Curated annotation (Swiss-Prot):
Keyword Nucleotide-binding: no
Cellular component, GO, one term: cytosol
Secretion signal, residue range per the UniProt entry: none
Name the UniProt record assigns to this protein: tRNA uridine 5-carboxymethylaminomethyl modification enzyme MnmG
GO biological process annotation, one example: tRNA wobble uridine modification
PANTHER family: GLUCOSE INHIBITED DIVISION PROTEIN A, PROTEIN MTO1 HOMOLOG, MITOCHONDRIAL
Gene symbol of the encoding locus: mnmG
Binding site for FAD: 18-23, 130, 185, 374
Family indicated by similarity: Belongs to the MnmG family.
InterPro entries tied to this protein: FAD/NAD-bd_sf, MnmG, MnmG-rel, MnmG-rel_CS, MnmG_C, MnmG_C_subdom, MnmG_C_subdom_sf, MnmG_N
């Protein structure tokens, strides 16, 4: 097909398909590069909607949001403006797993985005469905929509979330629909299959929502929180002045009886669902079956907006019929007279096999075509936003003829996320966990800014001035560490008496003790917390940095792109199959592919060495 037609008045630099959390980050990344962008979405009033829980952050996820902010993304800033509650998680478990979680006013979040995007000069927002990608010689050059519109562009980013050929499932009902009753379509799914892409069916779910006025709060536990002086964004000056509470209750024996009695009516257990659900966010039916020995399960009431008129019932995700949901809900303390605002449901949808992707999130099959978010088999707003940002950055790099930006595993959870997807793939919705990161002592909540700074600068998402400001912050911390190593506390000092010191020690050693409040030593130093973490974890950080350097060396060992793996002697059949499918670029990537063992890597290294020797001998 010709790249020019009567419908083509403008060739855009990029088209972003889908206005969810991934799509929004992609759009902003492209706009920061001063590129012309089209955003195609179903409903511009539901940009970055939250069809599941109204929250951002949590273990590992909160660190991802900090990384997004440090990389030049918007999720952290928007969350700070729309939050109605914010807190630390895992405070007692140490700084390596410390994370922020915030309850978000979901309506305000979407409104803030739309208001800001309307101001952007190089952006066109279209409400439509995509029906076909325009591809010629394995390169995308635009797309067609359901409304017969044609757009031409140098690159396309698909961020369709859970909307591709999706079905909402409740009991025996399977309704073609996207989340929150939005439109679905199989047009793009069919088009991707025609182009040769491997798709898979995945499933997720959501709980019922309850009118707050129908809840008996005398029977539930109120979460009382202090006002934390914290934010997701490193630049944000907005502070939450008042915390809005969430509430805790539990399922009962009656709840479990109703679920067990009606298990066959659940879409999940009736055989209606073929997609694989998220392992770490099971439905209430799954919990009752898999953990039958537990007498009760936690249920949290989370307000969806500042108005607090509707509560999200966290922990009660279900695909039961409406009558069973109502019966089930009324057995939970506090919900005896509950009125359901929206029933829970499961949703099944098409997703891409992420082994189809490069680390840049460009597809291997079609040049200039990028994928990000839940279409890549992930779950969660944070994972989606991170991918959208990386896809937006690299689509911009593609347009500008620059090298892609690829974040290493030792530099960020974003790097871990993408590396896992493109080397291991996933057969279930992938959720980021701290346990997935082998360098988590380095990938902390407090140092996301310095970890992402070089990538943000390379991407053009922060200025040289902003970059130097971050570098200056850590130079200041290093100078203060040196000062503290030369300053001592003697047993006669007031500080020594407070901490029962019997001998003279340096302030640096004292601040590294876990029971010492760093403010006693650094009352006026603005980066006291960061310094204290670095001092306390120094030995562990050095060890992980050393391990990371070994990984980096493997990343520098390139595998020839044209390598014929069938000629590599003594490879296991599984390694041969995986290498041919994934086509890793480096030995480091190859070593992380599931099913590949150290012997396979040795054989691969030996084969590459022989090839190099043969090339030299021919010269």
């Amino acid at each position: 097909m010709s790249k020019k037609s009567k419908n083509s008045s403008i060739e855009f630099d990029a088209i972003v398909v889908g206005g969810g959390h991934a799509g929004i980050e992609a759009v902003y990344a492209l706009l920061k590069k001063k590129l012309k962008v089209v955003l195609i979405t179903l409903d511009k009033k539901k940009l970055a909607s939250m069809p599941c829980n109204p929250a951002i952050g949590g273990p590992a996820k909160g660190i991802i949001t900090r990384e997004i902010d440090a990389l030049g993304g918007v999720q952290g800033k928007l969350s700070d403006l729309a939050m109605i509650q914010i807190k630390y998680l895992n405070e007692s478990k140490g700084p390596a797993v410390l994370a922020i979680r915030a309850q978000i006013d979901k309506e305000k979040y979407s409104k803030l985005i739309l208001k800001d995007l309307k101001k952007q000069e190089n952006l066109l927002i279209i409400e439509d469905l995509v029906s076909e990608l325009l591809v010629e010689k394995n390169r995308v050059f635009g797309l067609k929509t359901a409304k017969k519109q044609v757009f031409f562009s140098k690159t396309v980013i698909i961020t369709t979330g859970t909307y591709m050929d999706s079905k909402v499932l409740r009991g025996s009902l399977a309704i073609p629909s996207g989340p929150d009753g939005q439109q679905t379509s199989n047009l793009l799914s069919n088009n991707l299959k025609t182009l040769g892409f491997e798709l898979q069916r995945l499933k997720t779910g959501t709980p019922p929502r309850i009118f707050t006025s129908s809840i008996d709060f005398s029977k539930v536990e109120k979460e009382v929180l202090p006002v934390y002086n914290i934010n997701f964004s490193f630049q944000s000056k907005h502070k939450l002045k008042k915390q809005i509470s969430c509430y805790l209750t539990y399922t009962t024996a009656k709840t479990h009886d109703i679920i067990n009695k009606n298990l066959g009516k659940s879409s999940m257990y009736s055989g209606l669902i073929s997609g694989v659900g998220p392992r770490y966010c099971p439905s209430i039916e799954d919990k009752i079956v898999r953990f039958s020995e537990k007498p009760r399960h936690q249920i949290f009431f989370e307000p969806e907006t500042k108005k607090q008129d509707i509560m999200y019932i966290n922990g009660l995700s279900t695909s039961m019929p409406e009558d069973v949901q109502l019966e089930m809900v009324k057995t939970i303390p506090g919900l005896e007279n509950a009125k359901i605002a929206k029933f829970g449901y499961a949703i099944e949808y098409d997703a891409l096999n992420p082994l189809e992707l490069k680390k840049s999130l460009e597809t291997k099959r079609v040049k200039g075509l990028f994928m990000a978010g839940q279409i890549n088999g992930t779950s969660g707003y944070e994972e989606a936003a991170a991918q959208g940002l990386v896809a937006g950055i690299n689509a911009g790099q593609f347009v500008l003829g620059k090298k892609p930006v690829e974040i290493l595993r030792n530099d960020g959870y974003i790097g871990v996320l993408i590396d896992d997807l493109v080397t291991k793939g996933t057969k279930e919705p992938y959720r980021m966990l701290t346990s997935r990161a082998e360098y988590r002592l380095i990938l902390r909540n407090d140092n996301a800014d310095i970890r992402m700074a070089k990538y943000a600068l390379k991407s053009g998402l922060i200025s040289k001035k902003e970059y130097l400001k971050i570098k200056a912050k850590y130079a200041k911390i290093d100078r203060k560490i040196l000062e503290l190593s030369k300053e001592f506390v003697s047993p006669k000092d007031e500080l020594a008496k407070k901490y029962n010191l019997e001998k003279r020690i340096s302030k640096l050693k004292l601040i590294s003790w876990p029971n010492v409040n760093f403010k006693d030593i650094l009352p006026d130093f603005e980066f006291g917390y960061e310094l204290t973490v670095m001092a306390r974890l120094k030995g562990y950080i050095q060890k992980q940095n050393s391990e990371a350097q070994k990984m980096i060396r493997l990343e520098k060992l390139l595998i020839p792109g044209e390598l014929n793996y069938e000629k590599v002697a003594n490879l296991s059949s599984e390694a041969l199959d995986k290498f041919q499918k994934v086509r890793p670029k480096t030995i480091g990537e190859a070593s992380r592919i599931s099913g590949v063992n150290p012997a396979d890597i040795q054989m691969l290294l030996f084969h590459i060495k022989v090839l190099k020797m043969q090339k030299v001998s021919k010269i």
